[in-house]
Design a protein with these regions (language model features):
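C-terminal motif of bacterial Sec signal peptides marking the signal peptidase cleavage site
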Residues: 15-18
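Bacterial N-terminal signal peptides that target proteins for export
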Residues: 1-7
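Low-complexity, intrinsically disordered segments exposed to solvent
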Residues: 22-255
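C-terminal intrinsically disordered regulatory tails that are low-complexity, acidic/proline-rich
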Residues: 7, 20-21
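Sec-dependent N-terminal signal peptides
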Residues: 7-13
């Protein structure tokens, strides 16, 4: 009888081990946790940020160039205080460019004056739509910006920009075809400084928030800070990871 009981117990243990092996080897757990940040890595988010910053993808640097060009022309256009001026631009990349883009932009500019009716600052609002394709990611998006440009007086050495840039649309990764979905980007700019007369970016800062959704994988979210340098780059810190963004080419370098 003792041997019979031991045989039954051994059979049960072997059966349990076999079931467990089959479950672990071939059957996924039904309550498995979603992939962290929907599989969108910090590097992926940095590519999105780069596209929202650089000149060749209708980023903040491009918009800053447009609005300060308009600000520089105020003395020649004799724009009246409080009057809204509209401007529409269609912009495409050059043939054969490594980064391709096509955007339609509609600007509204209003000159703000002091109590003596002298130009004080320029308010700009923008709505845009289009697409770009970079080395690692492609995006179709639309968005807006509201920027105020200070430093209109001829004696001021710099143009100073404060405001917000927003983008919403869809993205596709070129390095992993499984990574595609929707994204939203919000950049709040503070003291973005462009040196006169060439209007090169020489300083300023910003905060950035990137969020979105990947079908069947869930949501992702990243936040960070941006420091605009005086050498054509910006330092992006995203969830603690530091990158250098080339504001002309959009190329990112991780540190």
């Amino acid at each position: 009888m003792k041997n019979f009981k031991l045989s039954i117990m051994a059979m049960l243990l072997v059966g349990a081990a076999a079931c467990n092996k089959t479950y672990n080897g071939t059957t996924p757990k039904s309550n498995s946790a979603p992939t962290a940040n929907a599989g969108v890595s910090t590097d992926d988010a940095a590519d999105m940020a780069s596209g929202s910053l650089s000149l060749n993808s209708n980023g903040v640097a491009n918009v800053a160039n447009d609005v300060t060009l308009n600000a520089a022309s105020v003395p020649n256009t004799h724009q009246a205080c409080g009057i809204v001026k509209a401007d529409t631009i269609s912009r495409q990349s050059a043939s054969g460019a490594s980064v391709t883009y096509s955007y339609n932009l509609t600007y509204s500019f209003m000159l703000l004056c002091d109590t003596s009716n002298h130009p004080d600052s320029l308010s700009s609002s923008l709505i845009y739509s289009g697409s770009y394709s970079g080395p690692n990611i492609s995006t179709t998006n639309s968005g807006s910006s509201i920027f105020t440009v200070g430093g209109l007086l001829a004696s001021a050495p710099d143009f100073i920009i404060n405001g917000e840039y927003k983008s919403a649309g869809s993205f596709k990764s070129k390095t992993d075809t499984a990574k595609n979905g929707s994204n939203n980007i919000d950049i709040v700019v503070k003291g973005l400084t462009l040196k006169k007369p060439g209007r090169a970016i020489v300083g300023g800062s910003a905060t950035i928030a990137i969020s979105g959704d990947v079908p069947k994988k869930g949501n992702f979210s990243y936040t960070g800070t941006i420091v605009f340098n005086n050498d054509g780059t910006a330092t992006l810190t995203l969830n603690g990871t530091v990158y250098t963004i080339n504001l002309y080419t959009g190329v990112k370098t991780r540190h």
